């Protein structure tokens, strides 16, 4: 069991063209508390088959896992089966891994995008909203990308994508990697969100 008392809140705020999610945590324990948090949003576009969506990530590293999905080591992404820096069609690959070493923009945000395919955009122009950008602030140093082909819907199982901003990788309570340690009464806050692409 987790022998600490950490008071957490999650605030969801609709903003123009998107959603901002703010996580806060306060350690109410008498001792320092280990802490990590992440979101688990799934995305599916009504305009086109999820198989045709294009996933793009500029992450530099991936956590390689064993048969139980426990990370064993960190590896460079470039040139591997996980490399999505040039965009990958969702229906062409399966992944359930944590990406890290995320490049940041001038505002300190990392970005992962899911977009309609060039073929769809060409055939249906003009298209107002072309995809979405999942952004995360510097407190979120990891993002898990999961592409199950078995997501249940009223019309059967379909391909979908989960893009999951996280402060640490899986199993961090055991490894300590990127784990937050909150002092007594320390307040921590971090944000991630989703913005429409045009």
Question: Where in the sequence are the language-model features?
Answer:
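Active-site pocket scaffolds in enzymes
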Residues: 124-198
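Asparagine-centered strand-capping/turn motif at beta-strand->loop junctions
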Residues: 23-29, 154, 196
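Short, hydrophobic/aromatic beta-strand segments
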Residues: 31-37
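Beta-strand-rich interaction surfaces with strong enrichment in secreted/lumenal proteins
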Residues: 9-11, 101, 177-182
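Active-site/ligand-binding surface loops and adjacent short beta/alpha elements
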Residues: 32, 42-137
């Amino acid at each position: 069991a987790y022998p600490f008392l950490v008071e957490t809140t999650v605030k969801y705020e609709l903003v123009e063209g998107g959603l901002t999610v703010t996580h806060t945590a306060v350690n109410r324990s008498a001792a320092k508390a280990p802490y990590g948090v992440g979101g688990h949003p799934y995305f599916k576009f009504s305009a086109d088959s999820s198989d045709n969506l294009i996933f793009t990530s500029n992450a530099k590293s991936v956590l390689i896992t064993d048969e139980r999905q426990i990370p064993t080591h960190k590896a460079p992404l470039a040139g591997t089966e996980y490399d999505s820096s040039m965009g990958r069609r969702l229906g062409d690959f399966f992944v359930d891994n944590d990406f890290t070493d995320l490049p940041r923009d001038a505002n300190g945000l990392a970005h992962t995008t899911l977009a309609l395919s060039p073929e769809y955009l060409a055939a249906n122009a003009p298209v107002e909203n072309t995809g979405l950008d999942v952004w995360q602030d510097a407190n979120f140093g990891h993002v898990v990308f999961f592409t199950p082909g078995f997501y249940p819907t009223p019309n059967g199982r379909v391909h979908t994508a989960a893009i999951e901003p996280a402060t640490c990788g899986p199993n961090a309570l055991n490894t300590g990697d990127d784990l937050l340690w909150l002092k007594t009464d320390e307040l921590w806050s971090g944000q991630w969100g989703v913005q429409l692409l045009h």
